[in-house]
Amino acid sequence: VGEEYAALGSTQFGSTINKIRLKRPDVIYAAVVGGSNVAWFKQLKAAGITGKKQTLLTLSVTEDEAHGIGGENLLGFYSAMKYFQSLDTPANKKFVTAFKKMWGKDAPIG
């Protein structure tokens, strides 16, 4: 239906989102990365594009970006995410402890 690119670091997606709203594709595949993800997801939701209405697949959302975006703006979307070390489960806590012991307390996971 369409393909559009934005410069790395872009935060204004109104034109692209308007095209999406007009064409109403079944699936939206976004390769937005970095801090641009925060603006992208918030602007999608503000435009009424949600996971309930369309399928959105995204390349990557990091743990920090997810916090900035807000869970309410990610509901219903699919992403290939990196490992989230803050996941609050016994198995994850055990893994993080073992990882930090082996690689150092400041070693990032994912």
Language-model segments: which ranges?
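Extracellular/periplasmic periplasmic-binding protein-like sensory domains
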Residues: 44-110
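Extracellular/periplasmic Venus flytrap/periplasmic-binding protein
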Residues: 1-47, 85-94
